[in-house]
Amino acid sequence: MVILEAINVSIIPMENKALPADCLVYKHSTTCPVSTTTGQEVRAMKTDLPIYWINVREQRELSNWVAQIYNVVHESPQLLLIRGGKVEKVWSHYEVSRNCFSS
């Protein structure tokens, strides 16, 4: 498993349809300028939760699975806080920042 470079957090590229009960899921578009900015913010977050990173254009099936399993309308960029296996909070577009969540 490759951990993406980050300052204070563990960012794990999502590779299959499995997530822990408590985590963050970041949906990133490699062609979106807003995602470029928010991706930098995610890398600078301070949290004890693992962050699972999905590149939505290249991993459409995983992105759709997350939207379906957690009943969340797909947007990107998008950050989901998952606690106890359920979505507790969702941030989209410029709402995603290093300060939007702290554990």
Residue map of PLM features:
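N-terminal "domain-start" segment that seeds a small globular fold
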Residues: M1-E15
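A short acidic, often aromatic-flanked loop/helix-cap motif at beta-alpha or helix-coil junctions
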Residues: I12-P13, Q59-L62, V96-R98
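Local sequence-structure signature of Cys/Sec-based thiol-disulfide redox active-site neighborhoods
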Residues: M14-M45
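Thiol-based oxidoreductase modules, predominantly thioredoxin-like and allied folds used
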Residues: K27, L49-W65
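Amphipathic alpha-helical interface surfaces
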Residues: V34-E41, E58, L62, V66
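Short loop/turn motifs at secondary-structure junctions and domain boundaries
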Residues: I69-V73
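Non-catalytic, surface beta->alpha helical segment in thiol-disulfide oxidoreductase systems
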Residues: E75, L80-S103
